[in-house]
Amino acid sequence: DATLLLHVNSLGYHEIYLNGRKVSEDVLSPAVSQLNKRSLSVTYDLTPYAKQGINDLLLWLGRGWYRKATFNAVHDGPLVKLRLDEIQANGTASTLLVTDSSWEGRGSMYGETGTGTWYPHQFGGECVDGRKALPDLTTATLDKLDWTPVLEVEVPGIEVSPQMCEPKRIQEIIRPKGIKQIG
C-alpha cells in the first residue's frame, strides 16, 4: 500500500482538511519563526483520510504574524506552498500535486477588525461573521461556493526547514460560568 505525505510550508497559519475531515489535532501551524529569514514546513500523513477517486483537499489559511508591519513581508499573506507525495511500499516516490496558479481560494468568516496594528505587543484582532460559516466541508457544500484564482507570489531570501518542535494543540476547553448583558 502507498503512503500519502503532504508537505506544507505556510507563511501564516494553516489547517488541512481532506474530504471534510481535519487531518491533525494541530492548531495555528506552523510554529512561529523569524519569518523574514526562515519558514517552517510541516508534513501530514493523509493516507487514513484519502479515498479512491477524487478527493477534496482544503487549506484553511490565516495571516498570523506574516504581515508587512511585523516582518517586512513582501505580501500581506497568508502564503502557502505544498507538495503531495505518494510513497510506494518499495520506497519509490512520486509527486501527485503541488500548489500553482490552477488553485482557487476564497475568503472565510474570519476578517480583520480594521482597528489596531500588528506590531509586537499590539494585536489587531479579528472579526468573525457567523453568516459566512459553512455547515460542513463536504464536496456538495464546497461546490456551491464562489472560488477565485489564487495569486502566485515569489518570496525571496527565506530558508525553509522542517518544524522540529511539538505542534500547538488545544489542551483544555474552558467554558463560561455565566453570560450576562452589560449596558
What residue ranges belong to the model's regions?
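Activation corresponds to long, low-complexity, non-globular regions
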Residues: 93-183
